[in-house]
């Protein structure tokens, strides 16, 4: 007897947090017996998981919805842009249903409505325990919370994803262990505000002892990182705001429990601009803490992101930012030109910076940081570093050191002269022989 299995097309846009949402939806679809396909034409329904963070992302999402409608006609929309249903309906009124971010149950209800769950499920015994993953098998994103309590004037995330909502620590650890047991070698911890984990919960909940694998633990970030560090995999922290308790993470890094890597979105170094952004932090205190962190953990890699051309930014403000870069000597830095976002307070602020000035400052910023990054990478030459293997081809190995997150940082190009049996996901020793502004070269 032939059984018909419905086909669902799927498009995932946006940041790693949205990717985790996509993985959750795909896991639910596969568990219910739906077949996931990479095309629109043969799909019984198409789901588009959108991004709505900045206007360019909104445009990309609207274009993806339009392509799906043109090629198929039966489209569900979810994700951050889904929180702005009127915006979507104005452009694409024929979309069947729209839900906001992390609305897994609503998405599945809509799928069942338009494409009923198949009576026969060919995947009932083959859905992996760790769920469907969109990343390579050797690394995975681990989302520890939803939403954000900050009210940064350039951002609309709280209006899209809501206030901070931390997952129970035992639930996170269960997922992390499943991933590690499935062969994942690197966990990338993500959220909108990783260092705020559990701060949305009552003191009673934070201090309450719970048990995981028979071990008594508390519900806080430090304990979470300590326990993740027992799983035998790389643990990399992203989106870590510089709260005071972040200092307590550095000894864990120095001891090798979690990777010596901090992704801290500092955004600017002018007190005036930071105040206008509604961003916390004393620049002098940040510099002092960076110095202390590096004394405790000399191998610490610091990544950050900054915005140039924020409304009201003068040449003096920008120079303060350049001065900060020179003193902080950050390893990895991303820079964005301020972009108006529909619904963000900063969009309507006075003293908007002309586009040509933004571009000029962006170029000066990047030139300086490239010099800093190149100098810091030069210090790695002659040393041996652990490298996780991402790709293998006839020219050699491409991997990442402990200082490199996937997609946003550099890579290590390796001449494989002594380890013919190297496989993707292996962690190997590489002696560094050359460096440029972003990448390293070496031999194993």
Swiss-Prot record:
The organism's place on the tree of life at top rank: Bacteria
Annotated protein name in UniProt: Ribosomal protein uS12 methylthiotransferase RimO
Cellular component GO terms, alphabetical: cytosol
Cofactor: [4Fe-4S] cluster
SMART domains in the cross-refs: Elp3
Natural source organism: Actinobacillus succinogenes (strain ATCC 55618 / DSM 22257 / CCUG 43843 / 130Z)
GO MF entries: 4 iron, 4 sulfur cluster binding; aspartic acid methylthiotransferase activity; metal ion binding; protein methylthiotransferase activity
Substrates-to-products reaction catalysed: L-aspartate(89)-[ribosomal protein uS12]-hydrogen + (sulfur carrier)-SH + AH2 + 2 S-adenosyl-L-methionine = 3-methylsulfanyl-L-aspartate(89)-[ribosomal protein uS12]-hydrogen + (sulfur carrier)-H + 5'-deoxyadenosine + L-methionine + A + S-adenosyl-L-homocysteine + 2 H(+)
UniProt-listed Gene3D superfamilies: Methylthiotransferase, N-terminal domain (3.40.50.12160), Nucleic acid-binding proteins (2.40.50.140), tm_1862 like domain (3.80.30.20)
Pfam families: Radical_SAM, TRAM_2, UPF0004
Keyword Ribosomal protein: no
Similarity remark: Belongs to the methylthiotransferase family. RimO subfamily.
MTTase N-terminal domain sequence ranges: 6-116
CDD domains for the chain: Radical_SAM
NCBIfam families, alphabetized: 30S ribosomal protein S12 methylthiotransferase RimO, MiaB/RimO family radical SAM methylthiotransferase
EC number in record: 2.8.4.4
Residue ranges that the Swiss-Prot or TrEMBL entry lists as coiled coil: none
TRAM domain: residues covered: 378-444
A GO biological-process term: tRNA modification
InterPro entries: Elp3/MiaA/NifB-like_rSAM, Methylthiotransferase, Methylthiotransferase_CS, Methylthiotransferase_N, Methylthiotransferase_N_sf, NA-bd_OB-fold, Ribosomal_uS12_MeSTrfase_RimO, rSAM
